[in-house]
């Protein structure tokens, strides 16, 4: 069983979003960092943010609030979609006020009910959209969190591979 996601849009020839479109590349990059921030452990994210110096001021546009979303699945990844169940999420929206790029807004949705995690992720999303902070946040927050996630995936894959059973059928000499 897999969780349903939106299918990738086919490449457009009319100037729409595709792999060669810089806006599309920027959107994919933002999706990647938002995914890393949302999936990171709250404590790891807070530790990484603590290493950044002189963070700009920000105002909370939409305070962190908890809610639920319906998760949909497909049997075998190909069957008809069905409602798998509800999942708790927390969302937050902030706007930077202490930078030259004061109109920058950061968004975050995180699984669970951790309001501080959502606010921290929204702040990092906003900072990553600025020229002044992008490189530092990517180097000190995003890359280390991505490495932690990759290490966890490798460890989990190793544990799964260790329990793999290979079944085979032997054919007897009967006709």
Residue ranges of model-derived segments:
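Generic structural signal of hydrophobic/aromatic residues within well-ordered alpha-helices
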Residues: 33-36, 45-49, 123, 137-141, ...
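A hydrophobic, small-residue-rich beta->alpha segment in the mid-to-C-terminal subdomain
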Residues: 102-143
């Amino acid at each position: 069983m897999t969780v349903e996601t939106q299918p990738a849009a086919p490449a457009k020839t009319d100037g729409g979003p595709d792999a060669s479109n810089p806006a599309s590349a920027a959107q994919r990059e933002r999706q990647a960092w938002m995914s890393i921030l949302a999936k990171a452990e709250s404590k790891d994210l807070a530790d990484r943010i603590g290493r950044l110096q002189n963070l700009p001021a920000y105002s909370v546009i939409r305070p962190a609030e908890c809610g639920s979303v319906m998760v949909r699945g497909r049997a075998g990844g190909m069957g008809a979609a069905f409602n798998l169940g509800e999942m708790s999420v927390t969302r937050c929206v902030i706007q930077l006020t202490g930078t030259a790029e004061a109109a920058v807004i950061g968004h975050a949705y995180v699984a669970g009910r951790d309001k501080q995690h959502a606010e921290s992720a929204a702040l990092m999303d906003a900072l990553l959209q600025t020229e002044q902070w992008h490189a530092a946040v990517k180097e000190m927050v995003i890359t280390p969190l991505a490495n932690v996630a990759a290490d966890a995936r490798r460890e989990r894959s190793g544990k799964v591979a260790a329990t793999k059973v290979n079944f085979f059928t032997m054919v007897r000499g009967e006709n």
